[in-house]
Amino acid sequence: MNQRLSECPWVVVRRARAPTGMIAVGVRGDTRSERWGGYAHQSAIEQIVEPNELIGLLRTSTGADRTPPIQLLEKVIERWQGLTLPWGPTGSVGFELASGYRVTTPHSDLDIAIRAPERIPVDLAHSLWERVMRLRPKVDVRVETSECGFALEEYVRRPSTRILLHYPGGARVGDDPWGERAPVSLAVS
């Protein structure tokens, strides 16, 4: 892990509980089995790059040898033109754009986060999903509210039923991502 960090001094934030003064982070390896989860002191963080900032980095980079997942992100940008909610790539595409280190493969999927502290109208959620659902490789869209995260696909397929809500301390089933508060047993201090 130390060798990997010396080669690529970037980590990703993990949505997990962390001790006071620490942030849960992940170190990427060359393969999924070479990933490591740990904690970093908040004071050790030198730069924070939000997913929505990465769209700008993509637009200013040269397109010489973009992998299929990066090309897929360009298609999503076209299809979501005008979306005012902050959004951007996470996962391997986000890591690659933020760090400059090649980690995507032709088979990597595209993970996207949409920040939605306010309720997204169901018709907007459907429209966003319909614009990307047939793209390949697969596009996984996670919506992040102020309390939890959830899969856009699950939300649009079952808008009036319970869905899996992800909290920093774990997941549980709920029916209102914007109204649910983390239960005491899952609350992060």
List the model feature ranges, each with a label.
Residues M1-S92, A125, W129-P137, V141:
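Helical scaffold of the NTase/Pol beta-like nucleotidyltransferase catalytic core
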Residues S43-E50, R162-G179:
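Mature, function-bearing regions of proteins
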Residues I77-L110, I114-I120:
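Active-site nucleotide-donor binding segment shared across nucleotidyl transfer reactions
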Residues T104, L128-R131, R158:
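Short, solvent-exposed amphipathic alpha-helical segments in soluble enzyme
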Residues P121-D123, F150:
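Short, charged/polar "capping" segments at the starts of alpha-helices
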Residues M133-G170:
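Conserved catalytic core of two-metal-ion nucleotidyltransferases
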Residues G179-E180, S185-V188:
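Polyanionic, low-complexity intrinsically disordered segments
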